[in-house]
Design a protein with these regions (language model features):
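Cytosolic, long alpha-helical scaffolding segments
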Residues: 1-214
Length: 214
């Protein structure tokens, strides 16, 4: 009877499968957001991909939160699991807000700094995807995990620099001659910076988990 009961309960390993699925959705969303910034027809086409992947990520997040409540033994602290999946979900939620802003303001041209910030977003998503399976072996992969989270934090710092450089150039180019253009560009920069900030949050949660287990 007890064996049958345990068979119905979510398995510890399932969390890592769910984290992996979520990270795949996040990466696909990041790649679609970057493709949007190529402009032209790519904007509308990739906008829908961002929306779809955000919905996929939401579905996985719900599965994780349900599994946390139903699982007797979790791979690490329940609060850490919630924090991790929430931070990952926040990253793609912010991508969705960015994509919506691009559509709302009908933006079809993007600066080199915006594109480089989007490149950083894709790289952050790739690093998260690399880090997720390593959480299944925290003790032996602590150094590798710490390196990946440090790379994400470095990308966040670079994105801040790109934001400031791009915004300064935009101000000199459009603040007087095209105030609306400056406002819209500022919004895009702000959204892109927030996406990278959310990835830095993911890195901080992962780093905290590593510290607790070594």
């Amino acid at each position: 009877m007890l064996r049958w009961f345990h068979a119905l309960m979510p398995k510890e390993e399932r969390f890592f499968d769910l984290f992996a699925r979520h990270s795949q959705a996040v990466l696909a969303g990041a790649q679609a957001l970057r493709a949007m910034l190529e402009g032209g027809a790519a904007v509308e086409r990739n906008y829908q991909i961002v929306m779809d992947r955000e919905h996929d990520a939401d579905d996985v997040t719900r599965e994780v939160l349900i599994a946390v409540r139903r699982t007797f033994i979790t791979p690490f602290d329940r609060g850490n699991i919630r924090d991790l999946i929430t931070s990952m979900d926040n990253s793609i939620d912010q991508m969705q807000k960015t994509a919506k802003g691009v559509i709302l303001f009908d933006v079809t041209e993007f600066t080199p700094q915006m594109k480089e910030m989007a490149d950083a977003i894709v790289k952050c998503a790739q690093l998260v995807q690399q880090a997720v399976p390593l959480l299944n072996s925290i003790s032996s992969e602590a150094v590798h995990l710490s390196d990946l989270t440090a790379q994400i934090s470095a990308l966040e710092g670079r994105a801040d620099e790109l934001h400031d450089i791009g915004l300064r150039e935009l101000y000199h180019a459009k603040s007087k001659s095209d105030p609306m253009g400056f406002f819209v560009g500022n919004e895009v920069y702000d959204h892109l910076e927030k996406v990278v900030d959310r990835f830095d949050d993911v890195a901080n949660v992962m780093h905290g988990i590593v510290i607790e287990h070594v």
